[in-house]
Amino acid sequence: ATEKNPEIKARLFDFDSTYLETPFLKSIKLRIYSDVKNAKFNIRFYSVGENGQPDKPIYEKNIIGISKKGTKNLEIDLSDLNINFPDTGLFVSYEWLIIEENEFKISFPIKDSKKRIEKTLYEPKVGLLPITQNTNSWLYKNGKWEKVERFKGNSPKPYLDNYGILAIELILTN
């Protein structure tokens, strides 16, 4: 989930010569967690820029996914879109949509106090995999792309002091 600022998290998939046999994206699989029903998110595909960051959109239209409430493995069919896997690699990105139907209000206690903090989050959450080195995960926030930083503070194991990359699987076809 994210707070009131739009965010896009992106993961790089490097090209492999075996993809020449199945060069088109057939579908994408994600692990989604949502506290609201029918939460919407956007999938985007980007080329790889000169500095290794996400660059230009590969597919211009929004690919809207809808998540039911709870934890789900979700597959989105891309076969009608004719998206070719570029030989320079491909960023797959997950965009949180800051819209009313994605709002989730949460309240939690302040340490050593009787007061509580109220926050509005925007669902759904996307699954992340912990990795020790960040070679391919980026975050678009406040108008620019930045490498994802290590999880800090009260992050649960196995994420603490590691990086999180999108838990995404791409299925290719010819």
Locate predicted features.
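Beta-sheet-rich sandwich/jelly-roll-like modules and their strand-loop junctions
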Residues: A1-V48, E95-W96, E100-N174
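Aromatic- and Gly/Pro-enriched, solvent-exposed loop/edge beta-strand patches characteristic
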Residues: K40-R116
